[in-house]
């Protein structure tokens, strides 16, 4: 609790540094409903991530004032149940929940006190709801049972919580649609005819619907509070573990890492300086140079040449302008690659491939022209003409034979009486 008070004092001191603190002091005389309306509006803005740190701190201050006023007025007691709480006071049960959510969003260098303060507010909200019998029996049984923290148990709790959260959201949506339908019907009735004495009962349902809406909102807030409390506990455990490790050997470990990196950098620069005067590479023969030689006749396509496609280099190596002299630099350059697929060949390689294809087509075309002009091709055309003449002579001979031998001429010898 001492850390919670320290966080509260720090946030109050930071709030006084802003010009809006004077306006907040002027709002100190506002009644509880007005303060709650302002604070809930800021909470809704913070939930939609449309509120800066100044607005978050202002909302925390307003919610803290609401919490103090609720405590002074004694609106809730541990001896009461939810049926004993009036409908107008149900919404003030959400003050510690809103305060826990808003406190968790406060940006601070040391986050552990913020997490503890947020957890305290959420636990206060859960304890008040438990005293008023607002928590479901299933949730109470899960929290009371000391089961091992396994993945199956956590999954079962999350599934049950999600179902209750979905039911609360559905209930709120139904109440909203019901109110909208009643508003439209009353508006239409007022335009058509005045409301009679028997129709005034329609207004009496507003109080019951408002109570149902606030109870559903509290049920939804409870589901979110349990999930947020689990998340804050895990975050606090992680931060405490990191802080403990840093306090134990964090400085020594960081110093060793820096010394090792410094030694490697110095050794790399020393080797590069010694290697520079003697290891200047010759200008490589690129694919573009080889393609120009092929076009101008100084080289042939079949000549041995390694057409290696070097991919584009992104990242520090390309910015510095140096070559990749070590395996580490090549691996680092491969990290800074674009999101799209790189080409598999260069323009020069594609041009050389097209040149090879064109040469093959030219050779094939020349061969076909040579075959068409060859002697065997011409002889083949003359033999085809002779074949046509032979077919014509054969057809004429067949016609002559049919004239000499009419149909059925030789069958008389086969008859019995012939």
From Swiss-Prot:
It comes from the Eukaryota. One of its GO terms (cellular component) is cytosol. Gene3D superfamilies: TAP42-like family (1.25.40.540). GO terms for biological process: regulation of dephosphorylation; regulation of signal transduction. Residues 367-418 are annotated as: Disordered. InterPro entries: TAP42/TAP46-like_sf (IPR038511), TAP46-like (IPR007304). One of its GO terms (molecular function) is protein phosphatase 2A binding. Residues 376-385, 393-406 have a biased composition (Basic and acidic residues). Belongs to the IGBP1/TAP42 family. PANTHER family: IMMUNOGLOBULIN-BINDING PROTEIN 1 (PTHR10933:SF9). Involved in the regulation of the TOR signaling pathway. Seems to act as a regulator of PP2A catalytic activity. This is PP2A regulatory subunit TAP46. It comes from Oryza sativa subsp. japonica (Rice). The lineage of its organism: Eukaryota, Viridiplantae, Streptophyta, Embryophyta, Tracheophyta. The gene is TAP46.
């Amino acid at each position: 609790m001492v850390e919670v008070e320290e966080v509260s004092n720090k946030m109050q001191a930071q709030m006084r540094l802003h010009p809006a603190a004077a306006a907040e002091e002027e709002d100190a005389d506002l009644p509880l409903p007005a303060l709650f309306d302002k604070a809930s509006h800021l909470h809704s803005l913070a939930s939609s991530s449309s509120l800066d740190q100044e607005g978050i701190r202002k909302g925390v201050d307003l919610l803290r004032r609401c919490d103090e006023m609720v405590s002074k007025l004694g609106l809730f007691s541990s001896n009461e149940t939810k049926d004993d709480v009036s409908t107008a006071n149900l919404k003030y049960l959400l003050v510690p929940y809103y305060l826990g959510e808003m406190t968790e969003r406060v940006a601070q260098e040391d986050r552990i006190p913020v997490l503890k303060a947020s957890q305290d507010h959420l636990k206060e909200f859960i304890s008040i709801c438990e005293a008023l019998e607002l928590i479901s029996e299933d949730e109470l049984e899960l929290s009371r049972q000391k089961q091992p923290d396994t993945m199956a148990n956590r999954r079962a709790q999350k599934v049950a919580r999600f179902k209750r959260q979905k039911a609360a959201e559905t209930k709120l949506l139904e109440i909203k649609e019901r109110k909208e339908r009643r508003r439209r019907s009353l508006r239409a009735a007022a335009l058509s005819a005045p409301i009679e004495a028997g129709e005034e009962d329609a207004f009496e349902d507003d109080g019951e619907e408002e109570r149902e809406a606030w109870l559903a909102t509290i049920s939804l807030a409870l589901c979110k509070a349990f999930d947020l409390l689990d998340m804050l506990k895990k975050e606090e455990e992680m931060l405490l573990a990191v802080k403990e490790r840093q306090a134990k050997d964090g400085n020594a470990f960081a110093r060793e890492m820096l010394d090792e990196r410094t030694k490697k950098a110095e050794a790399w620069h020393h080797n590069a300086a010694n290697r520079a005067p003697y290891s200047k590479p010759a200008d490589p023969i690129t694919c573009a140079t080889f393609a120009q030689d092929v076009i101008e006749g100084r080289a042939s396509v079949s000549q041995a040449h390694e057409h290696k496609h070097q991919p584009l280099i992104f990242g520090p190596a390309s910015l510095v302008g140096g070559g990749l002299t070590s395996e580490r630099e090549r691996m680092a350059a491969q990290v800074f690659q674009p999101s799209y697929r790189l080409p598999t060949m260069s323009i020069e390689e594609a041009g050389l491939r097209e040149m090879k294809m064109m040469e093959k087509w030219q050779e094939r075309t020349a061969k076909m022209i040579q075959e068409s002009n060859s002697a065997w091709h011409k002889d083949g055309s003359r033999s085809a003409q002779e074949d046509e003449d032979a077919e014509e002579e054969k057809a004429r001979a067949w016609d002559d034979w049919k004239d000499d031998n009419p149909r059925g001429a030789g069958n008389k010898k086969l008859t019995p009486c012939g």
